[in-house]
Amino acid sequence: MAALQLSWKARSDLVSVGEYTRRNWGEAQAIRYLDKIQDCMDRLAENPMLGRACDEILPGRRRMEEGRHVIFYRIEKRRIMISRILHQSMLPQGRVQ
């Protein structure tokens, strides 16, 4: 299993997702949704190739959808680097590093 590392932008994205969900659908739903995103990232750590390649956005990047969000990541030697967690309506160009 590869180690997971989140960029500071990905951490900020998670906080924003949690705050938005909490504000609009309540605490319990925010916890459930953030747990689903964490489960998805854990699956990526187990099998990094689950996500699709998205070289058109940035070479070497992959993406995995969870709910209405997309997790962008790259596979490194011993870790999975999560670069962003964006809502599906957000264009990733210029946001994913």
Language-model-detected regions and their locations in the chain:
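Short, well-structured N-terminal submotif of metal-dependent ribonuclease cores
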Residues: 1-6, 90-92
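A generic local structural motif
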Residues: 58, 68-69
